[in-house]
Amino acid sequence: RGNKFVCALMVAVLTTIVLPCFAQQHYGVMFYNVENLFDTINDASVADEDMLPKADRAWTVERFHQKLSYVARVIADLSDEDGFPAVVALAEVENRKVLEELVVQPQISSANYSICHFDSPDERGIDVAMLYRADMLSVEGCRAIRVNVESAPNLRTRDFLLVWGEMGGEKMLFCVVHFPSRIGGVKQTEHLRIGCAEQIREIVDSIVMADADRRIVIMGDMNDNPRNKSIAKTLRTKRKTKNLTHADLYTPFGNTKRGSSVYDDKWNHYDNIILSGNMLRGTEL
């Protein structure tokens, strides 16, 4: 099929890939860690004290509105001849209210984005979310999946977000994630990210068994690089498109020398988009 599905990863730098996939149309998909998109109202149920007008960060209404405008501009900048991205996955949003204010920003209001979001048990009060264009993605349902890591039963972190529907005549499932950070030590926290990856792999396997034709896109801040154990071994991702099966997961960033952020003068690619094999069978990038 001569169709194209465009995935764009937007973080500290912009990474784009164009995949031959399905419809005679382009569908833009992006992930963006917006880093602390909080409103200015104190929520006693979460630790948002640093993101208030009188806090050390002086998170005022003006700064909040400025950030909304910046995030909207980033989304708008990914527009192409087919318009705004069809799907925008986000990490580190405080609540639905900030998303409702984001989608009416003048830069993107004409996209008429719909919202998928659930409050998570994360201690910082940050969640993942997904915006989508209903004229491109017909959503049949969405749900939050609570993270369950056996080695850390009291872990309070971001839920996984699953959104399923139809795009370009194809059945789709989007999974938005934000794995636990490396704070406390890479090795000391690795089991948390591996536990998350195990759960995602189980979800993928169950979907593949029930509906082998459904195409899967996993995207988010995984706080690990594509060659780290959680992604390479636990998710069992492949770095080449040759001989992919519908049950395989492909990482387009497995061989890249650049990344999505820089720390200690070193590139990291913690922000990832991973695709099911049935999106790439018979193609070469």
Question: What do these predicted regions represent?
Answer:
Residues 93-171, 179:
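Structured beta-strand-rich core segments of catalytic domains in phosphoester-bond hydrolases
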Residues 45-48, 170, 174-189:
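Active-site His/acidic residue clusters
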Residues 53-62, 84-90, 117-118, 149-151, ...:
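Second-shell loop/turn segments in exported
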Residues 22-106, 112, 116-128:
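N-terminal, active-site-proximal structural segment of metallo-dependent hydrolase catalytic domains
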Residues 28-36, 56, 141-143, 171-181:
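Active-site-proximal beta-strand elements of phosphoester/diester hydrolases
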